[in-house]
Amino acid sequence: MDILEAAKKGKAKEIEALLAKGADLEATDREGRTPLMLAAQYGRTATVRLLVDKGAKPDARDTHRWNAFMLALLAPSGGVVHTTHDAVLKLLPQPKRFRLAITASWTPEKALFSSCFMRPEEMTQHMRQIHPDGMVIEALRHFAATSGRDLIAIVSADARGDTEISERPTPKDVDAVLTLQVEPGAACVQQVDRLSMLIQATLNRPEDQTPLLEKSFGAGVKTGMRGQSATNPNQHGPLYETWAKSQAGPLYWAVLTALLLG
């Protein structure tokens, strides 16, 4: 068993023996992952502690530019953060808390604004009252506060409605600006409104035109909102709100990953 395999399996005693025989503490696999990265990813707390004590570099990056903390948090074995990974995260240097500004606006999804119950201009007015952009901001704020591990502070949020104009300047003392374009849609199918909501997210450093992240969330009517249907206009708001909440987690982790890589 080599040191990489031992780290992955959490075999601390074998690692001690291998290091005594001159094994490389910073050996890497094909993806550039060191023993510390693998032990962190697989939640091997005792092994992580041993490797850190022996001087393993926690800030080393693999070929995808991920480090041990990112692997333990964002790509743990098993697909979700286990309690073992919490113990691992405490042993590794914590990243700085990122300061994020959000600007959001909404626009009707081009092809899909045909409600069974309202004409397009009525639907536009209805959406102005629902505030889909504000819903997405609120869902993201809530997720950051309750499930985001305090790694992102949302220091400013500007919901601009269906205009691009804002009286409020974006603060300069932030790590990044997240721009959200929310595209609510409705299609009349068999006397019910089939709803959709696409969220286009772009993340930029202040004064930098090259995005750290450009990604869509909640795509398509067929996949989007899992075929959520409204039998009257009063159901639009609650259904859009539920959908915004379901996208907050994927959006938050994508933003955090981009910031940690950036």
Q: How would you name each of these model-derived features?
A:
Residues 79-82, 87-150, 159, 254-262:
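A structural "domain/chain start" motif
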Residues 159-214, 222-225:
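Surface-exposed short loop/turn segments
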